[in-house]
Swiss-Prot record:
Heterotrimer of A, B and C subunits. Keywords: ATP-binding, Ligase, Nucleotide-binding, Protein biosynthesis. It catalyses: L-glutamyl-tRNA(Gln) + L-glutamine + ATP + H2O = L-glutaminyl-tRNA(Gln) + L-glutamate + ADP + phosphate + H(+); L-aspartyl-tRNA(Asn) + L-glutamine + ATP + H2O = L-asparaginyl-tRNA(Asn) + L-glutamate + ADP + phosphate + 2 H(+). Its EC number is 6.3.5.-. The lineage of its organism: Bacteria, Pseudomonadati, Pseudomonadota, Alphaproteobacteria, Hyphomicrobiales. The keyword rRNA-binding does not apply. Allows the formation of correctly charged Asn-tRNA(Asn) or Gln-tRNA(Gln) through the transamidation of misacylated Asp-tRNA(Asn) or Glu-tRNA(Gln) in organisms which lack either or both of asparaginyl-tRNA or glutaminyl-tRNA synthetases. The reaction takes place in the presence of glutamine and ATP through an activated phospho-Asp-tRNA(Asn) or phospho-Glu-tRNA(Gln). SUPFAM superfamilies: GatB/YqeY motif, Glutamine synthetase/guanido kinase. It holds the Pfam family GatB_Yqey. This is Aspartyl/glutamyl-tRNA(Asn/Gln) amidotransferase subunit B. GO terms for biological process: glutaminyl-tRNAGln biosynthesis via transamidation; translation. Transmembrane segments: none annotated.
Length: 500
């Protein structure tokens, strides 16, 4: 890959060193497991969590005479992902053998794509912010390529005191290796890139993005340089499996390299591992180059070819992606860019919000989903798929507010009841006597009693009309929060002679 610097140095992202400023350069190779029922070149299952070596075919185990057969669904998933990345789709690509010896690689080589990948250049737009002025910064990160390849098996070294075991369940599972250009200039940009990429493949349904299960992991390439100078020597941090760890690994590695260079040393090109317990990287091996793998075309596989109609059919069936959905939420529902960004960050959240917002005010629905629902889920460590409050229940609460049946304060209490106990919101309001008081006579009686009991406050209001809010609060307290706030405010102002 030819390295091209497309970014203008930005002082906001410089790292101060003992001898001046430095700039970190980051590129990523993300391995995303293809969502498919069977492996890339065999019919073995890809189901996660099965007993060791139970998802293994003769092809996966590299038994003599077994030939690979391409899985068409994996090809379609790769093309869908390429389209989602606004990338060039190569209608002719080749599979190559990447030769290296490792115990969990039965063939002695990995079937991958070297010179002719299935997907060419594309892009992802990430958004950083908001800043203190509430503004967002959009940054375009280039995609160099996407290619299909087999995953390796798994070596297990903690099962026996003197032996290592090999589990081939993962061997032969289809991976999409998505290679970015070296366009990122901070750990925040790298985390935003990984978050956005995971969101895109989840929307597309081409990868589940579950990093804790290993179905999405990143090799992070890090180098440093003086601003405006040529790229430095990079180190690759292998198999980082969380977005938080990606940020920590980049920050540590950048500081490590800066320290070496400022002491007069040189950076060795190498592969490193990130230790999340210590928050640091450590050397794994010297970094290999392409010639070390002795790539050559796989003689068992014909070139992969398809026509325009194949690509057009897949493009026509693509779902609405995060950027398009965010733009629609802002344009049609009047949401702020920030709120829309939160709601589209996960497909499940966007789907939930749209179900709540259907036929209702979009801003109101967004406030309840973001502030109340997501806030409650964050406090309990749950995600949107685990929510005890259905879209229908939250929508019913919003409807009760709009109808004047309950006040906003009562609605908060009602939400907590539904969250912890469940039930139909309307029935809960009825059975627990939570309806707000709209009877003007009853509200007026409460207002008169509060005014009569607080003559000193009445005098203060005459001098400072904004003090009327104190009376509103006292009336709401006296009625257990059930009085209609607008009616209370109007009566208080009328009784105290405050003009609107």
């Amino acid at each position: 890959m030819t390295l091209v610097d497309v970014r203008t140095p930005d002082p906001k992202r410089f790292i101060p060193g003992a001898t001046g400023d430095w700039e970190v350069i980051v590129g990523m190779e993300v391995h995303a497991q293809v969502l498919s029922n069977s492996k890339l070149f065999s019919g073995a299952s890809t189901e996660f969590g099965k007993p060791q070596n139970s998802n293994v075919s003769l092809v996966d185990a590299a038994m003599p005479g077994m030939l690979p057969v391409i899985n068409e669904e994996c090809v379609k998933q790769a093309v869908r992902t390429g389209l989602g990345l606004k990338a060039q789709i190569n209608k002719r690509s080749l599979f190559d053998r990447k030769n290296y010896f490792y115990p969990d690689l039965p063939q002695g080589y990995q079937i991958s794509q070297f010179k002719d990948p299935i997907v060419g250049e594309g892009k992802i737009v990430i958004s950083l912010g908001p800043d203190r002025q509430g503004q967002f910064e959009d940054i375009e990160i280039g995609i160099e390529r996407l290619h299909l390849e087999q995953d390796a098996g798994k070596s297990m070294h903690d099962q026996h005191a003197t032996m290592s075991y090999v589990d081939l369940n993962r061997s032969g599972v289809a991976l999409m290796e998505i290679v970015s250009k070296p366009d990122m200039r901070s750990s925040d940009e790298a985390k935003a890139y990984m978050t956005k990429l995971r969101s895109i493949v989840r929307y597309l349904g081409t990868c589940d993005g579950n990093m804790d299960e290993g179905s999405m992991r990143a090799d992070v390439n890090v180098s440093v340089r003086r601003p405006g100078e040529a790229f430095g020597t990079r180190c690759e941090i292998k198999n980082v499996n969380s977005i938080r760890f990606i940020g920590q690994a980049i920050e540590y590695e950048a500081r490590r390299q800066i320290g070496i260079l400022e002491d007069g040393g040189t950076i060795e090109q190498e592969t490193r591992l990130f230790d999340p317990n210590k928050g640091e990287t450590r050397s794994m091996r010297s970094k290999e180059d392409a010639h070390d793998y002795r790539y050559f075309p796989d003689p068992d596989l014909l070139p992969l070819e398809f026509d325009d109609a194949f690509v057009t059919a897949l493009a026509a069936d693509l779902p609405e992606l995060p950027d398009d959905k965010k733009e629609r939420f802002v344009r049609e529902l009047g949401l702020s860019v920030y709120d829309a960004s939160v709601l589209v960050s996960e497909k499940a959240i966007a789907d939930y919000f749209e179900a709540v917002a259907a036929g209702r005010d979009g801003k109101t629905a967004a406030n309840w989903v973001i502030n109340d629902l997501l806030g409650a889920l964050n406090r309990t460590g749950k995600d949107i798929e685990q929510t005890p409050v259905s879209p229908a229940q939250l929508g019913a609460i919003i409807d009760l507010i709009k109808a004047g049946t309950i006040s906003g304060k009562i609605a908060k209490d009602l939400f907590e009841i539904v969250l912890t106990e469940g039930g139909d919101p309307a029935e809960i309001v009825e059975s627990r006597g939570m309806k707000q008081v709209t009877d003007t006579g009853a509200i007026e009686k409460a207002v008169d009693e509060i005014i009569a009991a607080n003559p000193d406050q009445v005098e203060k209001v005459k001098a400072k009309p904004t003090m009327a809010a104190w009376f509103v609060g006292q009336v709401m307290k006296a009625t257990g929060g059930k009085a209609n706030p607008q009616a209370v405010q109007a009566l208080v102002k009328a009784k105290l002679g405050i003009e609107e």
